[in-house]
Amino acid sequence: DCCWPGRPDCCAP
């Protein structure tokens, strides 16, 4: 998992 508040770009395709 790599998606949390402050790092939404982490879960972008």
UniProtKB/Swiss-Prot annotation:
UniProt note on tissues of expression: Expressed by the venom duct.
Keyword Disulfide bond: yes
Domain of life: Eukaryota
Post-translational modification: Contains 2 disulfide bonds that can be either 'C1-C3, C2-C4' or 'C1-C4, C2-C3', since these disulfide connectivities have been observed for conotoxins with cysteine framework V (for examples, see AC P0DQQ7 and AC P81755).
Record-level Gene Ontology MF annotations: toxin activity
Signal peptide: none
Annotated compartments: Secreted
Keywords associated with the record: Disulfide bond, Neurotoxin, Secreted, Toxin
Membrane-spanning residues: none
One GO CC term on file: extracellular region
Domain notes: The cysteine framework is V (CC-CC).
Function noted in UniProt: May act as a neurotoxin.
The family this protein is said to belong to: Belongs to the conotoxin T superfamily.
UniProt protein name: Conotoxin Fi5a
